């Protein structure tokens, strides 16, 4: 019997599907690897986030795809995820249940591997620098409403303080830490006015032969600060097993970044970046804790209480 995914695939390609495999690890969308005389990625998008904002996300994608094809972007190997169109010419397909789907060609590559040490960290920084250089070629980038507050500490703090259900079981240690540090975190500000990825963790990079060649999950491309991307990237590869910042790794990340984007950020900015990495961790911890308390389910859990555990690690270990 034809599966749901196979029915959706028929709207994009007319080839027999030989394998459907769900890929785990994403927080928001359901992602499937499709094999059908080639490999593809099929995604069921989160309706609560995407409904009503597909045009904005499509506009940003087309701007990014165009920038990836500019001469300066092609000096080294770089891939842009290639969204596919349905038979009716649309990137997105809505099924009879109202679910929104998207399909793109699978990009061969490797994930970030911490076992490669500082070499992969340098290449991650270089890849992020290259991405920022490419994004400079994008015109009229919009701020998709579903992701407009990704790094907005005031937005998430308000959500946190507005939680007042009588049966809510709070974690005293986290409440105390948030109240103690919120003003300090709010006071850390950085320059804005750039186009950024918005979620530039190393899990959204792909590598070939040790070189960063692609960013995936580009729906979060938006106006912002390069510090947001640098902090996301550093948080995902420069924090040790105790939750402390490894400054040696950070220096390698910044060296790669400088080489990838023609000295866009100076090494003298390192101390500000370190403060902003702490703020980045604080905001993410606040989001995990708020999601745990509200039961909203924005972040998928592999076990009950995982979001609370992540919040504890982010909010109670300081750099």
Spans of model-derived segments:
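ATP-dependent phospho-/nucleotidyl transfer catalytic cores
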Residues: 21-25, 44, 51-55, 110-122, ...
């Amino acid at each position: 019997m034809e599966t749901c995914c196979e029915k959706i695939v028929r709207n994009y390609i007319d080839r027999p599907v030989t394998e459907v495999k769900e890929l785990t690890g994403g927080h928001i969308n359901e992602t499937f690897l499709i094999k059908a005389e080639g490999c593809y990625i099929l995604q069921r998008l989160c309706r609560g986030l995407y409904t009503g904002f597909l045009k904005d996300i499509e506009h940003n994608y087309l701007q990014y795809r165009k920038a990836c094809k500019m001469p300066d972007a092609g000096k080294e190997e770089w891939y842009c995820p290639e969204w596919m169109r349905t038979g009716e010419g649309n990137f997105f397909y809505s099924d009879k249940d109202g679910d929104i789907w998207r399909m793109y060609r699978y990009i061969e590559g490797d994930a970030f591997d911490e076992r490669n040490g500082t070499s992969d960290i340098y290449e991650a920084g270089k890849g992020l620098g290259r991405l920022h250089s490419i994004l400079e070629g994008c015109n009229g980038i919009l701020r998709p409403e579903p992701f407009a507050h990704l790094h907005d500490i005031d937005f998430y703090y308000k959500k946190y303080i507005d939680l007042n259900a009588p049966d809510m079981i709070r974690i005293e240690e986290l409440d105390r830490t948030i109240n103690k540090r919120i003003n300090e975190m709010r006071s850390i500000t950085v320059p804005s006015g750039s186009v950024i990825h918005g979620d530039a963790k190393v899990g959204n990079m792909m590598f070939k032969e040790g070189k960063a060649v692609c960013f995936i999950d580009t729906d979060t491309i938006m106006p912002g600060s390069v510090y947001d991307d640098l902090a996301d990237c550093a948080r995902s590869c420069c924090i040790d097993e105790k939750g402390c910042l490894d400054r040696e790794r950070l220096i390698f990340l910044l060296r790669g970044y400088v080489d990838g984007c023609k000295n866009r950020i100076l090494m003298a900015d390192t101390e500000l970046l370190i403060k902003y990495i702490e703020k980045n961790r604080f905001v993410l911890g606040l989001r995990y804790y708020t999601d745990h308390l509200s039961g909203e389910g924005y972040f998928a859990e592999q076990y009950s209480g995982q979001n609370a555990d992540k919040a504890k690690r982010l909010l109670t270990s300081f750099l």
